[in-house]
């Protein structure tokens, strides 16, 4: 008879212990309901980047002296610098500069070691595309600073030239006007 009573007592103790654990976990859950959310709603809210954030590289074509220091310090030899030696003035003339951001590891060595400070890191971090070849930026694309990280409703594109071109191409060609 005693083993049966001790079994009931053990069962009762285990039940009380389980109820206490459930109560503690419920109290923790309730304490989290008063907190503000940690995550942000990404497409609608953008996270504020830090001052030392290493985003897309900005390139200033006029400052570059084609010394290729950026290529030498890059761990993956990524920047492509095309230049031509001007024999009459004995200086290099930069022809083309490009970086493939699909391969870039954003280490910032090229920016740090550039002697003319023609490279800088921007706060732009949205570089995703459906085609990886679109991530190969030339000097024109690298020279553009982002207007805004988000689409601003105050900035509107001028589609006047595009619409007038479409109107011209929609008309069928008249062979008499072309020959006369």
Curated annotation (Swiss-Prot):
Its EC number is 7.1.1.-. The keyword 4Fe-4S applies. Pfam families: Fer4 (PF00037). Residues 55-84, 95-124 form the 4Fe-4S ferredoxin-type domain. Belongs to the complex I 23 kDa subunit family. Binds 2 [4Fe-4S] clusters per subunit. NDH shuttles electrons from NAD(P)H:plastoquinone, via FMN and iron-sulfur (Fe-S) centers, to quinones in the photosynthetic chain and possibly in a chloroplast respiratory chain. The immediate electron acceptor for the enzyme in this species is believed to be plastoquinone. Couples the redox reaction to proton translocation, and thus conserves the redox energy in a proton gradient. GO terms for biological process: photosynthesis, light reaction. GO terms for molecular function: 4 iron, 4 sulfur cluster binding; iron ion binding; NADH dehydrogenase (ubiquinone) activity; quinone binding. It is a peripheral membrane protein. [4Fe-4S] cluster 1 binds at residues 64, 67, 70, 114. Its cofactor is [4Fe-4S] cluster. This is NAD(P)H-quinone oxidoreductase subunit I, chloroplastic. GO terms for cellular component: chloroplast thylakoid membrane. It comes from the Eukaryota. Keywords: 4Fe-4S, Chloroplast, Iron, Iron-sulfur, Membrane, Metal-binding, NAD, NADP, Plastid, Plastoquinone, Quinone, Repeat, Thylakoid, Translocase. It comes from Piper cenocladum. [4Fe-4S] cluster 2 binds at residues 74, 104, 107, 110. The keyword Lyase does not apply.
């Amino acid at each position: 008879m005693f083993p049966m009573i001790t079994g009931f007592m053990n069962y009762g103790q285990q039940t009380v212990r389980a109820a206490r654990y459930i109560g503690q976990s419920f109290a923790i859950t309730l304490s989290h309901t008063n907190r503000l959310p940690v995550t942000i709603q990404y497409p609608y809210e953008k996270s504020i980047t830090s001052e030392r954030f290493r985003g897309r590289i900005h390139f200033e074509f006029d400052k570059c002296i084609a010394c290729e220091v950026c290529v030498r310090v890059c761990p993956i030899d990524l920047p492509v610098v095309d230049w031509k030696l001007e024999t009459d003035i004995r200086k290099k003339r930069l022809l083309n500069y490009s970086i493939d951001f699909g391969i870039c590891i954003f280490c910032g060595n090229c920016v740090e070691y550039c002697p003319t400070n023609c490279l800088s890191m921007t706060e732009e971090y949205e570089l995703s595309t459906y085609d990886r070849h679109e991530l190969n930026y030339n000097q024109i694309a690298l020279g553009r600073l982002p207007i805004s990280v988000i689409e601003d409703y105050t900035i509107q594109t001028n589609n006047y030239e595009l619409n007038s071109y479409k109107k011209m191409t929609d008309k069928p060609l008249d062979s008499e006007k072309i020959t006369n």
